Amino acid sequence: MEVQPREIRRYTTAEGRAPFTEWLDALRDRNVRVRIKSRLDRVEQGNLGDFKSVGQGVFELRINYGPGYRLYFGQVGLTIVVILIAGDKSTQEHDIRQAIEYWTDYEKRESTDK
């Protein structure tokens, strides 16, 4: 099976906010930021690792470290991954709902831009 490299994009709201970037920048633990960025590097190389669908086109990428970090993303075709939002196990339900809202918004705005 051939590995498919992926381009990572970060979701931005209509108001110009980047929820994932804001979350990542707010992390105080530098080691956590390094682990998350390393995980995203592997995604770019085509290795999604531990992930699952959470519904409506949104996927959860799990990072088994600390409180159980999760990154939520949508995928455009086979090669583009759009990082929507992130959190940990304690905020999982809220984060999934928010990620689905962001993904719906992303798809809606992308379809009107064409």
Predicted segment positions?
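Basic, Lys/Arg-enriched alpha-helical interface segments
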Residues: 1-67, 77-81, 88-114
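Short, surface-exposed beta-strand/loop micro-motifs that present aromatic residues
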Residues: 70-74
